[in-house]
């Protein structure tokens, strides 16, 4: 691994443009997004509906960047920071794999430059100030039963989904129900990822909805005078992190909103700085085209005024067979043929946004030549561009064909958004449900209708950031492959007025995940020499 300063000098940055965090990590100055050079080409990486283990979207993003570098391109990648929840939960580390990783992987996975703890602290500072205000006289007349801002922690802990605070004598605070969300679902995480400068950051923080008064009036973080101290905590967290891939490609790794319960992309400042420093930028969006990619097209790229010049859609034989109902070990051509419907539907989603994607078939050792050949024939017959990707095993060399096809697909596209910003919230939700998920309709529970009314009173033309299972186009994780004839049920709608969007809660999705029966944490260890093992 090279010193990060060597890579920074190759980029052409001066000493005032960055701050070192050890030998291998750095933070970049926010002013770099205003350099004013010609805009680069942005390549978005998304995926088909995944299995719980994931389909290698981050690995593909990294490997594609390495392949483009081998072709002589001036390229960088932009991915999200890992959360401790998945690291210790099902997935383990989230920095790529094999010969296509970002380094130093162990540090990036475990606290990195401190952005996640800082965002968690800023979020919980507001929670503390809300309760403190009610304890000391409650001048704003906040209703303890109508506090809408939860607490946060970067850990999967189902026991914190619903709690009581202030239990005990009067000096323990105000007794009230409360809850935790995981840090990637925190509104402060979203705000950090969407803010472009400190002025923007403070304005967004001040607009966070804290709760309502006993007379049903909204109270914001600005009313509690919390935005200044929150912004002070977030000063360095707003600056994007620069590291490198296995083969020395510059890698922006910044903020970490989940794609299923948040907006699912790396920070706008990371993308914008990368676009000003490189000719090609590859950025990823969480989970499938129905989640992270939908939010990138309809939300993030709109807010950041980002181009989208090409899309890569990651698929695996494993996931295709899963959606095809495969129950047997070894080759299963019939399951490939059946499960390919899921992939084709994701391709159509991207085409509906105005871009013809390139499918990257991320090869696993268990894939047979017959299965790959069968999938290739299906893709060819549907006019879908595709390439076999072997970047896990071979690094950049394993992605040359993919890189060439992606470069050939680059263009200036007129993006077709799913909804108009002037649409009302109900219409926006229904358009996403029908046009992206393929739902027949949407059912709004009583609480969702009440929440929607409040949101429309508080916010003007908000974006919509759906919270939905990643395992199905529907809101039911058991409906695999290419479901039809289903309706979406909106249980409630969270108001993220600081971030500028509402979060409809669909089906049984949780904003605080739980650990599996045998979490990845059981396999992680520290050796006597200080080496971390079991993260991958």
Swiss-Prot record:
A GO term, aspect molecular function: ATP binding
The UniProt record lists the keyword ATP-binding: yes
Gene Ontology biological-process annotations: tetrahydrofolate interconversion
Pfam family, one: FTHFS
Disulfide bonds, paired cysteine numbers: none
Pathway named in the protein's UniProt entry: One-carbon metabolism; tetrahydrofolate interconversion
NCBIfam families: PRK13505.1
Protein name: Formate--tetrahydrofolate ligase
Record organism: Thermoplasma acidophilum (strain ATCC 25905 / DSM 1728 / JCM 9062 / NBRC 15155 / AMRC-C165)
């Amino acid at each position: 691994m090279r010193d990060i300063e060597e890579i920074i000098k190759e980029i052409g940055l001066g000493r005032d443009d960055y701050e070192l965090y050890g030998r291998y990590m750095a933070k970049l100055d926010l002013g770099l997004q205003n350099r004013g050079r010609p805009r680069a080409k942005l390549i978005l990486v998304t995926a088909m509906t995944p299995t719980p283990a994931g389909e290698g979207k981050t690995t593909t993003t990294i490997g594609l960047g390495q392949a483009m570098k081998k072709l002589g391109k001036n390229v960088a990648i932009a991915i999200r920071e890992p959360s401790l929840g998945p690291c210790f939960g099902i997935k383990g580390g989230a920095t790529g794999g094999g010969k296509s990783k970002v380094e130093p992987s162990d540090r990036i996975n475990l606290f990195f430059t401190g952005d996640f703890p800082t965002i968690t602290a800023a979020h919980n500072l507001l929670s503390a100030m809300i309760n403190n205000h009610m304890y000391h006289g409650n001048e704003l007349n906040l209703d303890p039963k109508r506090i809408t801002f939860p607490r946060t922690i970067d850990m999967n802990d189902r026991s914190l989904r619903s709690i009581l605070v202030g239990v005990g004598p009067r000096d323990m605070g105000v007794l009230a129900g409360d809850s935790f969300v995981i840090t990637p679902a925190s509104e402060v995480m979203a705000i950090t990822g969407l803010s472009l400068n400190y002025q923007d950051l403070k304005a967004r923080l001040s607009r966070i909805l804290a709760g309502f008064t006993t007379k049903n009036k909204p109270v914001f973080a600005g009313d509690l005078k919390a935005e200044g101290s929150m912004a002070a905590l977030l000063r360095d967290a707003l600056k994007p992190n620069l590291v490198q891939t296995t083969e020395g490609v510059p890698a922006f790794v910044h903020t970490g909103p989940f794609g299923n319960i948040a907006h699912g992309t790396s920070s706008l400042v990371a993308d914008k700085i990368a676009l000003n420093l490189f000719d090609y930028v590859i950025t990823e969006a969480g989970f499938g085209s129905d989640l992270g990619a939908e939010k990138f097209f309809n939300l993030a790229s709109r807010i950041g005024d980002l181009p989208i010049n090409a899309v890569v859609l990651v698929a695996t034989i494993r996931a295709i067979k899963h959606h095809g109902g495969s129950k047997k070990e070894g080759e299963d051509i019939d399951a490939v043929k059946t499960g390919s419907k899921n992939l084709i539907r994701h391709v159509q989603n991207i085409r509906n946004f105005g871009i013809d994607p390139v499918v990257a078939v991320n090869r696993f050792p268990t894939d047979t030549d017959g299965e790959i050949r069968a999938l290739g024939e299906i893709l060819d017959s549907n006019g879908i561009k595709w390439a076999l990707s072997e970047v896990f095993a071979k690094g950049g060399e394993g992605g040359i064909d993919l890189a060439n096809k992606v470069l050939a697909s680059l263009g200036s596209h007129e993006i077709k958004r799913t909804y108009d910003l002037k649409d009302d919230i109900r219409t926006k939700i229904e358009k996403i449900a029908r046009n992206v998920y393929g739902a027949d309709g949407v059912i709004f529970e009583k609480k969702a209708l009440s929440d929607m009314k409040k949101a429309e009173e508080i916010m003007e033309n908000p974006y919509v950031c759906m919270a939905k299972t990643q395992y199905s186009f529907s809101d039911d994780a058991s409906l695999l492959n290419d479901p039809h004839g289903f309706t979406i049920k909106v249980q409630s709608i969270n108001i993220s007025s600081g971030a500028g969007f509402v979060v409809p809660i669909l089906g049984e999705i949780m904003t605080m995940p739980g650990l599996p029966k045998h979490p990845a944490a059981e396999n992680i260890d520290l050796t006597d020499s200080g080496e971390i093992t079991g993260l991958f």
